[in-house]
Amino acid sequence: MKETKSAGTQTEKNLMAAFAGESAARNKYTYFASKAKKEGYEQIAALFLKTADNEKEHAKLWFKELNGIGDTAENLLSAAEGENYEWTDMYDGFAKTADEEGFHELAQRFRLVAAIEKHHEERYRALLHNVEMAEVFAKSEVKVWECRNCGHIVIGEKAPEVCPACNHPQSYFEIHAENY
């Protein structure tokens, strides 16, 4: 992704802090909304969610200023690198510290989440490979493709350009998988 005009400045640090703060607030408010709903406060839950949506948009403003959104391949690489940091460095360090401080159950939870982050990295790298090799909607063997809009099934090496049932574009197709 491109470097920003504010690179290396306090303004860049402020943009990163604003993005992090707005992102954290969004998540926190969605958790608060869930709790309010469980306690029977529908209006309060709705207002927490409305505010969470506002915070999401605020975060997006600052993330865009930081040139944080690239094309899909750049975004997949960025996501994979972020997940790699989380499982190889961040959670590993957190687990060691928790163990040293006697929080062994929390250390184990950090390790379990690190394993999930490793899976996330692998998934993003596989998707990046598919994008780079133009293999998102075309495979070397016959697959069952499903339209995510209407559920139409197509069998072949590639997804159709347009769904014959609902006219949605190829981008709505994915490889059909039963997981139940």
Label for each model-derived stretch:
Residues 1-180:
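Non-heme di-metal
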